[in-house]
Amino acid sequence: MKLAIIIVSYNVRHYLQQCLDSLYRAVEGIDAEIYVIDNHSKDNTVKKLKGKNRGVKFIACNHNHGFAKANNMGIRRTKSEYVLLLNPDTIVGENTLKECIRFMDEHENAGGLGVRMLKCNGSDAMESRRGLPTPMTAFYKMCGLCAKYPTHKKLGKYYMGYLPWDEPAKIEIISGAFMMMRRTALDKAGLLDEDFFMYGEDIDLSYRLLKSGFDNWYLPTKILHYKGESTQKSSFKYVHVFYEAMLIFFKKHYGHLSIWLNMPIKAAIYLKATTALIKTTSEHIQKTLGFMPDRRRKSPLYIFISTKESISRCRSLADRNGLDAQYIVTQTP
């Protein structure tokens, strides 16, 4: 088996079906298998999708195990040369996987690989390339210096904004939304750390791949990632869980500095969480009173991912109907 694709789902049935539809074309010509680990969804994901996706192996959990443990359940069932951790809210181009596998085959020391992710508005997702969140790198991000100087090699290292978007590059942290790994590298580095329930586990595993002597790479082949569509990033719960995950990472890899880091990191967690709580409460009150500004797009953005021939037809359709569209051309194998 060349490739095993592991998808962890939780109440994202419609996104998951779109993801699977894109994968069916992407795996053509590849010896691949697809696993969906459902974390006890309330939207009947397994019941609704299992019958119409008979080539997919569904595993229904009796409760929510979290991202790391659910992925590990899938990984342990596979013996493929490469493993891909893929978010259910993604759409993969028909040649994305072939390009990634070809790159990994040609770079024997590549332990992990990430790709160029596009957000639902068509812009580049900054987490496509990230640097290791050392204490100083994390400090620069939390205090806003990373956002102010995104292309600076030191201040902007969290998102590695100094790297070109259209060229392959060595990076440090791969996003768990699309994380392809070599089996031998994964065996040496170990599976995802299940102390992380959600967020941070991709950072931890990426770091362990580097510490095991492998390289992590960014490849500019594009996928669509609906990040934020099912998660309110400004919510109290999201901010608290995210920064708690960062605290677990710091304790694990920078334990010798924990005396100096625990207090400021904890302070950052609760400051960010409190700010998010105030913001969401304020927005709720404004919305209730009718003062909330309309943030809806006047015109939706359409993203077409296909071959050059198909894109030409899509472009004509968009032009005739005045659609705001972006086009991703995949190469014909």
Model-derived regions, located:
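Short, well-formed alpha-helical segments that are part of the catalytic scaffolds
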Residues: 7, 12-27, 314-315
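A conserved acidic beta->alpha catalytic loop
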Residues: 22, 38-46, 63
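Glycine-rich, basic loop-to-helix element that forms the pyrophosphate-binding segment
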Residues: 60-78, 99
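Short aromatic/hydrophobic "clamp" motif used to bind/position activated sugar donors
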Residues: 83
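Conserved donor NDP-sugar-binding/catalytic core segment of glycosyltransferases
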Residues: 91-127
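Short, flexible, basic/aromatic active-site loop/helix in glycosyltransferases
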Residues: 132-171
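A short, conserved alpha-helix in the catalytic core of glycosyltransferases
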Residues: 164-167, 172-222
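Active-site-adjacent helix/loop segment of glycosyltransferases
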Residues: 207-285
